[in-house]
Amino acid sequence: MMNPLIIKLGGVLLDNEEALERLFTALVNYRESHQRPLVIVHGGGCVVDELMKGLNLPVKKKNGLRVTPADQIGIIAGALAGTANKTLLAWAKKHHIASVGLFLGDGDSVKVIQLDEALGHVGLAQPGSPKLINTLLENDFLPVVSSIGVTEDGQLMNVNADQAATALAATLGADLILLSDVSGILDGKGQRIAEMTAAKAEQLIDQGIITDGMIVKVNAALDAARALGRPVDIASWRHADQLPALFNGTPIGTRILA
């Protein structure tokens, strides 16, 4: 079996039916023309935010990470492992792709520890066991994995989806594409940066050009590039016409170098 390609989905994509249609059309075409197994990892911040708003619950973030109190983890897990995950499974079904919905703890695919007590139920993902997902891939299933995990002592944790995808890529020895709302990492003038090294990222963070959630995304991509020993792509799901080229290894956003 070829090494898998992990596609991490996030941002407001889950709220955009036209974009989901284009994305799944590109996935179908890729699966038909390549024997390479695919895995989807997803967050769903927009789904969580809508639910929190409907329940009149405050949304707090610290350094780009969602603060998750004990009384909110059940709601967030329901939104991500439930609504967001099943929405993607429904799109896969519509496009005749046999898919399986998972969370990080299934088959110990990704291990999770608590990141910081101040953040509450927020986890740090670490490589786990490839056994379950490899079994699914060998049988032509598309695993769709939410970014909810569980600690060794059974505590549910909300994990940043970029970081979750990175840990799963390390588990499977997979290539990784991080799809987001933006077309890549932008410089101070709003221009896309084609390639990014750790030194350059540090410089842009110090200058306040890379901020908030993008810091988390860039650090996850740098971690992945180092762990995997190969580049990681950050690109936008908005450019549907370019997705086939991206899946084939052509950079269309920012390529993060190890």
From Swiss-Prot:
InterPro entries recorded: AceGlu_kinase-like_sf, AcgluKinase_fam, ArgB, Asp/Glu/Uridylate_kinase, NAGK-NC
The protein's enzyme class: transferase
Any one biological process term the GO annotation gives: arginine biosynthetic process via ornithine
Chief location category: cytoplasm
Keyword Cytoplasm: yes
Record keywords: Amino-acid biosynthesis, Arginine biosynthesis, ATP-binding, Cytoplasm, Kinase, Nucleotide-binding, Transferase
Function in brief: Catalyzes the ATP-dependent phosphorylation of N-acetyl-L-glutamate.
Family: Belongs to the acetylglutamate kinase family. ArgB subfamily.
HAMAP family: ArgB
Entry protein name: Acetylglutamate kinase
